Amino acid sequence: MILARGEILKLIKDGSLGIEPFTEDVVRENGLDLRVGNEYAIYAFENQVIDPCELESTRHLFSIVEAKDGRIIIPPRSFALLTTMEYVKFPRDVIGFCNLRSTLARYGLGVPPTIIDTGFEGNITIEVINNSGNYVVLRPGMRFLHVVLAKTIGEAKYQGKYLGQRGVTPPKGLKGECS
């Protein structure tokens, strides 16, 4: 069951769904519009062979950058890891499906299918892909990520690698997980 504005506001009011900082305009008709944070991550190197199965950490592969002059510039046919301004805390029976706002998609931007798990807590780090041949500018504080909330049947507690993340978080290595 997808949650509409009224149900989302009830979850926020009763403390089940946490959003910090919170402004009511973040709550839309059928989801949340989260805002761009102040930092982003891009690859520090190009033309490297990256094998996630051989890495314990990937921090050395990325440069974490503060938005200069209030702008994040995503080069053509490239991507950046962005973080949300908001720190969210999801209930154990609500999941979030992430999409880019359609206006931004019309400029050639996209995000891969991304789910916010039940019980997740932290800033959302998400890959924003520039599929266009142009440089596209995003600005901290602008609404960019639309999150559709749905109730799950039963509850689950998130125990993943990214619990409690703050700011933009590069991927974790997969060493030990691959056969």
From Swiss-Prot:
Task: Give the GO terms filed under biological process for this record.
Answer: dUMP biosynthetic process; dUTP biosynthetic process
Catalysis performed (reactions): dCTP + H2O + H(+) = dUTP + NH4(+)
Q: Which NCBIfam families match?
A: dCTP_deam
Positions that bind dCTP: 101-106, 117, 165
Q: What does this protein do?
A: Catalyzes the deamination of dCTP to dUTP.
Which Enzyme Commission numbers does its entry carry? 3.5.4.13
InterPro entries registered for this protein in UniProt: dCTP_deaminase, dUTPase-like_sf, dUTPase_trimeric
Please give the Gene Ontology molecular function terms for this protein: dCTP deaminase activity; nucleotide binding
Q: In which pathway does it act?
A: Pyrimidine metabolism; dUMP biosynthesis; dUMP from dCTP (dUTP route): step 1/2
The record's note on quaternary structure and interaction partners says: Homotrimer.
| Coiled-coil segments | none
| Annotated active site | 127
Does the keyword Transferase belong to this entry?
no
The UniProt entry's sequence similarity note says: Belongs to the dCTP deaminase family.
Protein name according to UniProt: dCTP deaminase
Alphabetized UniProt keyword annotations: Hydrolase, Nucleotide metabolism, Nucleotide-binding
Species this chain originates from: Caldivirga maquilingensis (strain ATCC 700844 / DSM 13496 / JCM 10307 / IC-167)
